[in-house]
Each structure stands twice: as structure tokens, then as C-alpha cells.
Curated annotation (Swiss-Prot):
This is Catalase-peroxidase. Its cofactor is heme b. Binds 2 heme B (iron-protoporphyrin IX) groups per tetramer. It holds the Pfam family peroxidase. It comes from Escherichia coli (strain K12). Keywords: Heme, Hydrogen peroxide, Iron, Metal-binding, Oxidoreductase, Peroxidase. Homotetramer.
């Protein structure tokens, strides 16, 4: 029978001939554009976490809901939960303290100070990949144990806050005094797609510590939070782990003392789990069958839980009192001699060979065992610098307690930004340098003050390009990941930002603005810098024939140099800023990808990014004053010329050299070079998504819309760190 007969017959019987195969016919299935073009520009990263994914709606106010919370009632419920052992996941020694501490630690421990991404501030442990990370085995059980409490308190407490608070309560209920707790972490409702977890395709692929210093990666192996507890690449060598430990904790902004305190404090309570071979453990939550309902790692070893639990494959209990705070970690570390052994699962660990059996069994009170340690625990004894700190903590338990309390607070709050974002009754009063503290406002300019300042700025002799450049340089350091940077504080005038190459032209305007501030005697330099941008944009729009008002919210303050951690602020120096046509290094990604990265850090959408780049170019705001991307003969006028000329087919573009970083736009008829451009310019004509937006702004009826959109995006960037306006 012919093919046509087959089709005819199936149609005759009421069956669609194209629906008879086994292909997945659901939305999103099949080969995607990224399968065909894996290097396609990730413009989609600018569309994350929209209201379309948020079930609470755009009017939901978490801070307002939190104010209704019975905070101490919640803590009381968490305390009770700690000792309410559940048969489906029995508690070690009748306490979930160690489990909840690990949950909080691993939620916060994804933070990287290099790019400010990761951390506990968004509740990302609920989603892939972190919910199925090899280092997060069994934390699905911790989150599920918390569900009745989350259900009870509803939206008055976010998952993100609850994870960290549960860790704090676990410590407190074990006899430890924490430094405090700041709430304010708002949940998101889908995975972060912008976090670069690394290029490795296989779990637990080893990375050299030197590589970590050059990339925004938080762990030494794909799928770990920090380092391999068995030593680098399962080496079993404590001393060789020191470099890896310093690299990973250093990437979180931790020094040696904080690192020692965190490792020891985190290993004072609880245990690891390796009752049997990890081959008995089933798929992670993302791969588990639907009937598992979001849980994973089901084990077929014995009962699979309690005494038979398998998590990391390591079977370590550090202290004699694993549910009560003590200094036993350091006492055992230095008191005994340690020999390498293997867990029942075959993982490398150490046992105190000369110790008596003093460690209680988690489920059988009649049993005892010898103290055990991870390979990386012994690093604190054998690395010379770590040893000095560890011996000091051994001899001064109070110093250890204080160091751990502060380091734990830093770990769990590092990605929350300034203290003004913290809410709740247990926020510490002390300002900490890593919070980028700011002084209290002493004066808020009146409307007349603002008018007078605008006149002074307009008459200062600074060009539109200079006014716009100085404001952008101040505000554009903001990072949406950890809420650092921004215009508030005027740290552009301080070290290290004042000396950054990218700011060389912008800071030339500072003496003029500082003089205006001095003469005003009231306004902050931070406000004046942003107001300079307002004046520049309004002048540029007026020159284009449009009378506009750029919104301005006063109230910024000026930070002092002693409130500015130079080393930590160095991390805000951009590798590239496509908005200013700046790129410092050519060995890191493509120029256009780095533009997307910068826009995502500034929480911009694709249209906002497009409008800002187009406007910055015609305003002549390139970092070095170059003409790259300045597709206009009327610089300083807020026109849509950038888009009109970029999309004009009269011009063809050719790279100036093999690097293909710079290009010339020549008239097709005369061959005359009309414009020059970078990849950050041409991407708006090359990438199909960005071109679609550029075509809107290049249209004959788009000038007013472009100016309106540019102003809205500009004001957004200027106010990104104005958490007091929320």
C-alpha cells in the first residue's frame, strides 16, 4: 500500500496521521534554538522573575506582611520542630539542629563576592540546580520538615528568610548565642538563570584553586558548595586542601579567621551520613519520579533513613555533644592522632586512633564510637596559618564563639546589601564594614534647593556628556545580586573607584561638583552627582526639541573612606561596561555577552538596556570620549539617531582587525568611513531580539517614546540603591 493510501486510511478512521508517532508533542519539547545555536546571546536573562511567574502579584509587599508576623511565636514553633522527630526522616539524637544548620549554610554558601550572585536572599535552594546539587543531598528533607511552619505563617515569612532563621534557631537551641538576624529576603518563583556555575558537564569535576580566583565560581568542584571534604579530587590529603579552602571561602569574602570559625562552628553540631554504599541512593529531586513529590535520593539501603541514612557517603561525628554547643571540635582536633580510614560507603575520612569511644551513636544510646573528622577538618591543624588560629580558639573558647557568631551572621546576610534592608526585632545595632555602611542623613534638600542646585550645575561649564558620564559612573556599580554599589554614598569620589580606568573621564567632573556642594553647604555630593545627570538629560532632551522633567529623589548621603572596604569595592570594578563602550580584558566572554551581564546586574529589561545604550551613545558618554557607536552628528542631543543610522542599509560594516572588536561603517556607494562601532553597538542590529527592539526606536514616530523610555530607565538606574524609597 502506498504512503498516500496510509494517510488516506488513517484520516478516514478519524486519526490524525501526524499524531501516531512517539514524539513529545508538548509545548517547549523538541529541538530548540539553543540546540542549533548554543552560543546564542542570552537576552532571555533580562526577562527573569517577572510578575508572570509570581503567584503573589505585583502589589504584594513582603515588608508589610512581615510586620504582621508573630516573630517570637515563629521561633517558638521552630524550636519545637527541632525535637519533633518524624518517622519518615528520623532526627539524629532526636534533634534536627545539624540538618537545619546545614540547610542554612548551603543556602547562603553559594554567594560569590566576585559577581555578587548566589546566596540565600532569594530562596533558590527550592529550585534546580541547587535543590538537586550533589552537596545538598537530604536537604530536601529539611525543607519538607519546615513546610507545616511555612504553611501556618503563610506569606508573613518567606522561604528564604525561614531557611536562615531555622539555622539560627538550631544554633540557639543548642546553647549558642547568635549575633542576630535580619529578615527581608524576598522569595522568587523560578530558578536564577544568570548564575554561572561553571562549564563542567559532570558532577564533582575538580577545579584547580588558581582557576577560582579568575572566575565567579564558589566551589572547587561542580556540584559542591565549597570544597571536596575528602580533599582536592578525593586526594585524602589535608594539607593540600588549604589552597582550595582559602580560594572558596575567599570568594565569599571570608578571611582565614572567619574560615576557621565557620568550618569548626559548622562541624560542632550534627553529623554526616554514610551508612552504606552511595550506589543505593536513588535519583535527585529533579530526576525523581513524580510520585516522590519533590523529594529525592530515596535509599534502598536498609530502612533508608535514620541509622541507615546515606547523604555524602561520609560517616563523621565530630564531638561528644552533637546537639549541644561546645569547644570539643578543637579539643579533639589537637588532642588525638588521626589516621586515614574509610566510611562504610567507602569515602575517605579520619579517625582518632588513640581516642576512647566517647562519641554517642545517633540512634542507639548503648553504642559509642571514636571521634572522626573530615579530611578538610584536619587542614585546620596542619596548615600553619590555620593552625595558629585554631590553637587560639582551642585556648580561648569565647574568642571562637564570638568569631563564629560574627562569621555566621556575615555568611547568612552577605548578599542582602546594606543594613537598611534588614527588618525584624533581632537586627544588630552595630554597623559592619562588609555592609557598606552609610552615615545617617543630616539634610534633605528642599524643592528650592534642588532648583538652585540645578541652575548651578547647568552654569558650571560641564558638557552634557560630562554630566551624564559622572552620574552613570556613580550609579552603575550597583549589583542586583548582593545589592552592593550604586550612587548613594558618592563612593565614586573615594578610593578605589576614583582611580578606576573606566572612571577616568567621569571623575574629571568631580572637582566642579564638589565645589558646588561646598558652596551649597547642605546637599550631599551623592545627590549632586545624580542631579548632574538629571540636568544633562534634560538639556539633551531640550536640544532635541522636547521639554521633559527627569524625576529626582533627594536623600542620598556621602560615605567616608573609613566606611569603605577598598578590597571588597575593588570587586565592583567592571571588566566591561557596554553602556560606556568599555572593556578591560578580551579573555573573558564576548563583549555583547558582558553587556547582557552588566544589564542583568542592573536589573534591566532588554528594552531598558536598548534605550540606555542608544541614549548614552548620542550623548557622547563613552568612557574614553571615543566616537565608537556615536551614530550622530549632533552629540549631546537626545535623539534616536543611534538606531536610525545603525539600521540604515546605506552602511556596511567591516572589522578593523582580526579581533573583530572594532568595526567601520562605510557608505556602500562612496566607501567613505561614516561611523565606527564596537560589538556592544552592532549587537543591536545583529541579534534578532535586540534588533526587534531597535526597530521600534528607529521608527519615524518613535522619538518621544524613545526619550520617555530612556528617562524611565535612567531614573531606575539612579535609584537602584535607594531602598529607603521602597
Amino acid at each position: 500500500m502506498s504512503t498516500s493510501d496510509d494517510i488516506h486510511n488513517t484520516t478516514a478512521t478519524g486519526k490524525c496521521p501526524f499524531h501516531q508517532g512517539g514524539h513529545d508533542q508538548s509545548a517547549g519539547a523538541g529541538t530548540t534554538t539553543r540546540d542549533w545555536w548554543p552560543n546564542q546571546l542570552r537576552v532571555d536573562l533580562l526577562n527573569q522573575h517577572s510578575n508572570r511567574s509570581n503567584p503573589l502579584g505585583e502589589d504584594f509587599d513582603y515588608r508589610k506582611e512581615f510586620s504582621k508576623l508573630d516573630y517570637y511565636g515563629l521561633k517558638k514553633d521552630l524550636k519545637a520542630l527541632l525535637t519533633e522527630s518524624q518517622p519518615w526522616w528520623p532526627a539524629d539524637w532526636g534533634s534536627y539542629a545539624g540538618l537545619f544548620i546545614r540547610m542554612a549554610w548551603h543556602g547562603a554558601g553559594t554567594y560569590r563576592s566576585i559577581d555578587g550572585r548566589g546566596g540565600a536572599g532569594r530562596g533558590q535552594q527550592r529550585f534546580a540546580p541547587l535543590n538537586s546539587w550533589p552537596d545538598n543531598v537530604s536537604l530536601d528533607k529539611a525543607r519538607r520538615l519546615l513546610w507545616p511552619i511555612k504553611q501556618k505563617y503563610g506569606q508573613k515569612i518567606s522561604w528564604a528568610d525561614l531557611f536562615i532563621l531555622a539555622g539560627n534557631v538550631a544554633l540557639e537551641n543548642s546553647g549558642f548565642r547568635t549575633f542576630g538576624f535580619g529578615a527581608g529576603r524576598e522569595d522568587v518563583w523560578e530558578p536564577d538563570l544568570d548564575v554561572n556555575w561553571g562549564d563542567e558537564k559532570a558532577w564533582l569535576t575538580h577545579r584547580h584553586p588558581e582557576a577560582l580566583a579568575k572566575a565567579p565560581l564558589g566551589a572547587t568542584e561542580m556540584g559542591l558548595i565549597y570544597v571536596n571534604p575528602e580533599g582536592p579530587d578525593h586526594s585524602g590529603e589535608p594539607l593540600s586542601a588549604a589552597a582550595a579552602i582559602r580560594a572558596t571561602f575567599g570568594n565569599m569574602g571570608m578571611n582565614d579567621e572567619e574560615t576557621v570559625a565557620l568550618i569548626a562552628g559548622g562541624h560542632t553540631l550534627g553529623k554526616t551520613h554514610g551508612a552504606g554504599p552511595t550506589s543505593n541512593v536513588g535519583p535527585d529531586p529533579e530526576a525523581a519520579p513524580i510520585e516522590e513529590q519533590g523529594l529525592g535520593w530515596a535509599s534502598t539501603y536498609g530502612s533508608g533513613v535514620g541509622a541507615d541514612a546515606i547523604t555524602s557517603g561520609l560517616e563523621v561525628v565530630w564531638t561528644q555533644t552533637p546537639t549541644q554547643w561546645s569547644n570539643y571540635f578543637f579539643e579533639n582536633l589537637f588532642k588525638y592522632e588521626w589516621v586515614q580510614t574509610r566510611s562504610p560507603a567507602g569515602a575517605i575520612q579520619f579517625e582518632a586512633v588513640d581516642a576512647p569511644e566517647i562519641i554517642p551513636d545517633p540512634f542507639d544510646p548503648s553504642k559509642k564510637r571514636k571521634p572522626t573528622m573530615l579530611v578538610t577538618d584536619l587542614t585546620l591543624r596542619f596548615d600553619p596559618e590555620f593552625e595558629k588560629i585554631s590553637r587560639r580558639f582551642l585556648n580561648d573558647p569565647q574568642a571562637f564563639n564570638e568569631a563564629f557568631a560574627r562569621a555566621w551572621f556575615k555568611l547568612t546576610h552577605r548578599d542582602m546589601g546594606p543594613k537598611s534592608r534588614y527588618i525584624g526585632p533581632e537586627v544588630p545595632k552595630e554597623d559592619l564594614i562588609w555592609q557598606d555602611p552609610l552615615p545617617q542623613p543630616i539634610y534633605n534638600p528642599t524643592e528650592q534647593d534642588i532648583i538652585d542646585l540645578k541652575f548651578a550645575i547647568a552654569d558650571s561649564g560641564l558638557s552634557v556628556s560630562e554630566l551624564v558620564s559622572v552620574a552613570w559612573a556613580s550609579a552603575s556599580t550597583f549589583r542586583g545580586g548582593d545589592k552592593r554599589g550604586g550612587a548613594n554614598g558618592a563612593r565614586l569620589a573615594l578610593m578605589p573607584q576614583r582611580d578606576w580606568d573606566v572612571n577616568a573621564a567621569a571623575v574629571r567632573a568631580l572637582p566642579v561638583l564638589e565645589k558646588i556642594q561646598k558652596e551649597s553647604g547642605k546637599a550631599s555630593l551623592a545627590d549632586i552627582i545624580v542631579l548632574a545627570g538629571v540636568v544633562g538629560v534634560e538639556k539633551a532632551a531640550s536640544a532635541a526639541g522636547l521639554s521633559i522633567h527627569v524625576p529626582f529623589a533627594p536623600g542620598r548621603v556621602d560615605a567616608r573612606q573609613d566606611q569603605t572596604d577598598i578590597e571588597m569595592f575593588e570587586l565592583l570594578e567592571p571588566i566591561a561596561d557596554g553602556f560606556r563602550n568599555y572593556r578591560a580584558r578580551l579573555d573573558v566572554s564576548t563583549t555583547e555577552s558582558l553587556l547582557i551581564d552588566k544589564a542583568q546586574q542592573l536589573t534591566l529589561t532588554a528594552p531598558e538596556m536598548t534605550a540606555l545604550v542608544g541614549g548614552m551613545r548620542v550623548l557622547g558618554a563613552n568612557f574614553d570620549g571615543s566616537k565608537n557607536g556615536v551614530f550622530t552628528d549632533r552629540v549631546g542631543v537626545l535623539s534616536n539617531d543611534f538606531f536610525v543610522n545603525l539600521l540604515d542599509m546605506r552602511y556596511e560594516w567591516k572589522a578593523t582587525d582580526e579581533s573583530k572588536e572594532l568595526f567601520e561603517g562605510r557608505d556602500r556607494e562612496t566607501g567613505e568611513v561614516k561611523f565606527t562601532a564596537s560589538r556592544a553597538d552592532l549587537v543591536f542590529g545583529s541579534n534578532s531580539v535586540l534588533r526587534a527592539v531597535a526597530e521600534v526606536y528607529a521608527s519615524s514616530d518613535a522619538h518621544e517614546k524613545f526619550v520617555k523610555d530612556f528617562v524611565a530607565a535612567w531614573v531606575k538606574v539612579m535609584n537602584l540603591d535607594r531602598f529607603d524609597l521602597l
